[in-house]
Amino acid sequence: VEYFVSYYDYYQPEAYVPKTDTYIEKDSAINEQIDRMRNAATRNILEDNDVIIVASVSCIYGLGDVESYSQMTIPLKVGDEISPREVHRRLAELQYERNQQNFVRSTFRVQGDILDIFPAHYEDRAWRISFFGDEIESISEFDSLTGKKTADLKEVTVYPANHYVTPRPALSQAIVHIK
């Protein structure tokens, strides 16, 4: 069972009060736990897992194009030839933040040939990708708090850090049409 409900702890829409000529700016606060649950629900649907989604009215608002979102994933498999720098670049495109100090959801860190990724859909688990040159040598899952390895994996798919990512070609095309 997954949840796809409104992720706002607080939401103040923008408003204008003509009587006092006052503009009230939009303000909001996003609940990190609910955001993680929304990402987990999206991942489970796209991976065709048997899943029940409990949703609120917020699910009727568009998340964008499914094909575009799916294009933005990064499949990683043991034995794949891909440069670590390319993976770092792709993670940044997926709105993951490189952070060596504060390893939290939707971040990654690099130590030599080791890349740690804290997926947007996990609460307490992360992935360690070990490279030998430009080849993925191993992938493991570990507890993000203790660092203890919990599983050896053959492959993983990294999903975007949030639902509002756009592939570069679509972004370039939109810019041309706006001009």
Name each model-derived stretch.
Residues 1-179:
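ASCE RecA-like P-loop NTPase motor cores
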